[in-house]
Amino acid sequence: QSIGACSGTIVAGAIFTLPAIYILQAKYPEMSVSFVKVFMSSLLGGILGILFMIPFRKYFVKDMHGKYPFPEATATTQVLVSGAKGGSQAKPLLIAGLIGGLYDFIVATVYWWNECFTSRVVEWGAVAADKAKLVFKVNTGAAVLGLGYIIGLKYAFIICLGSFAVWWLIVPGMSMLFHDQVLNIWNPEITQTVGAMSAEQIFKYYGKSIGIGGIAMAGIIGIIKSWGIIKGAVSLAANEMKGGAQASADTVRTQRDLPFKFIAIASIATLLITFIFFWFGVMEGNLLFAVVGILLVTVIAFLFTTVAGNAIAIVGSNPVSGMTLMTLILASVVLVAVGLKGTGGMVAALIMGGVVCTALSMAGGF
């Protein structure tokens, strides 16, 4: 299971940042990045993600047992348990799989109806969407229905409230407040006024950006709320490093972690290799830029590890894209402040973002 998940998390970590390098090459032909740099950023980020997550395993898996739904892990466990018992226990699993597969085949392949129901299909809904920018949408996919069942009513309700806030408050609100204005400071390709856009366009150009900002702020709040967890994990590591409590021989194997001494040594070694990679492979021998880069990567990756863990434990989805965008913004501002600009600065920020993004994706995946 871990081997299968590992490939997906590595790809998820790299896909948000590294393709941007090749997209920018169309505008800046002098920008070039070798495959080795792309490979190293994913490799080092993946190792850091695993090492940073281990100290928090006990908190998420043991201390918070029964309090977090862990939707994806719960679904996987139920499949394994039902399959192991066989007979009558496996029968509902097989029936559910057949029903879900048949339903998705009818919707996604045969197209008997649209997977995403929208109020635009009725006359009054189309009028409300065009005039007031009010749209009601429901994704009827079997996977979404199953996710809602797994995470429970509380967290499903919170997710729905977020959707309502975007589609029924932010989208029509922006149309009312900025009806005759062209808001294109961050995207010069936008030429329409907000009022001339459809509700879907307002969501695409502005609603998503506001949501990403919300994720970034939630990440900061998550770090603040998780500060006690972070201190506890660091204190436990320091205590063991000094020769404190060790795992008892009677401790169940599945409750044992790698020794903190090993984690500390491996983390330091990985960070040292990352620093050398930044120094000679990304920053072209500039020591100051390399030091700033490794400090940013270390602090952001470690602090956001708890946020990734919380997100996976609650909704089963890792908001790694929002946290990566925040990393890119911080990295760009800091690197420009210390003097790294131009295409070199773009490549450096994206490589650093790739390391952090892969680390967070790997931490959430495991």
Language-model segments: which ranges?
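Alpha-helical multipass membrane-protein architecture
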Residues: 1-366
